[in-house]
């Protein structure tokens, strides 16, 4: 793959991106974060992180000491899953391989955070049915799309609106997964309440039609997410917990900016986090998906919601904020964003194709193009074989 054409890199060495910052108990050397990136290389059965490639992949991207690495979405339990090749962290065999991955990251003097993931209606009902599992959702009055509704009918596994007992079990599963993460050597966990997955489905009035204490009002829709937050604060400590949100996201049939109450909903969540912070329980960070990318399945520049901004979060939440969404090709925007001393920047797809991304950002070097066709394939190709800048020059990529 050649370098990205038409891109004029700018060195960010003299910006706050290369100032240290403390996240929880970890002292980062810079603020360029590797965010969660689903890669579908785990082995089935068992949802086990890939024993051959995963530690190599993460170690390559942790090569700059002091880098914050947030893992790909990781299932907290079989019931939370439904993708055969995404990893989990509920079993001893999974934990054993995560230990190797975290060791590879720590050997580079970088830091490992595990994203804890529950799919909800974004899962595959036929895969769940095969394994004797429910097709869970916030409320069964609406499906994510017609295709999944048909799959659910064909598999005789219709949507199941979580009962209060189900919610309690999910919280127990989050606790178990968080404990396993720390026991395996992770520095912390990120609760995934974004991009249309289960916790996000409770936050959004399009997917949440409940009439009990988990639906109907802003406070009720936020209840499940905040109960998970509180459970993990008590289990592993607030300094080891972060939360990811996507206020303007439309992925997996979320409302995004079309919902008039979206700012009010997320302002409430952030306000509740700040209340906990003032009581001595400040989370390590909040991670926001930008309206620059409302749907991560689209290419850069597509799907931007130009009528919204996440700037509102800064007046409510006073802790660190990771901002992610189409920043790699826009260093001039990063230069402005990181003027705020609490801001970190998440770089997704270009961290896939540039294992030495932090070095390239610092020096203002060209970026390797990524190959989207290898994002989710069971292969080392497009996973561990992207070259560093020096290797790419040796390959002649700078001449293509």
Curated annotation (Swiss-Prot):
Residues in the signal sequence: none
Membrane-spanning parts: none
Highest taxon in the source lineage: Eukaryota
Gene name as annotated: OYE3
Its EC number(s): 1.6.99.1
Family: Belongs to the NADH:flavin oxidoreductase/NADH oxidase family.
Binding site for substrate: 192, 195, 376
Protein task: Flavin-dependent enoate reductase that catalyzes the chemo- and stereoslective hydrogenation of electron-poor alkenes. The enzyme is reduced by NADPH, and oxygen, quinones, and alpha,beta-unsaturated aldehydes and ketones can act as electron acceptors to complete catalytic turnover. The physiological oxidant remains elusive. Has a prooxidant activity, increasing reactive oxygen species (ROS) levels when overexpressed. Formation of OYE2-OYE3 heterodimers contribute to the induction of programmed cell death upon oxidative stress.
GO BP, one annotated term: apoptotic process
The protein's name in its UniProt record: NADPH dehydrogenase 3
Catalytic residue positions: 197
Subunit structure: Homodimer or heterodimer with OYE2.
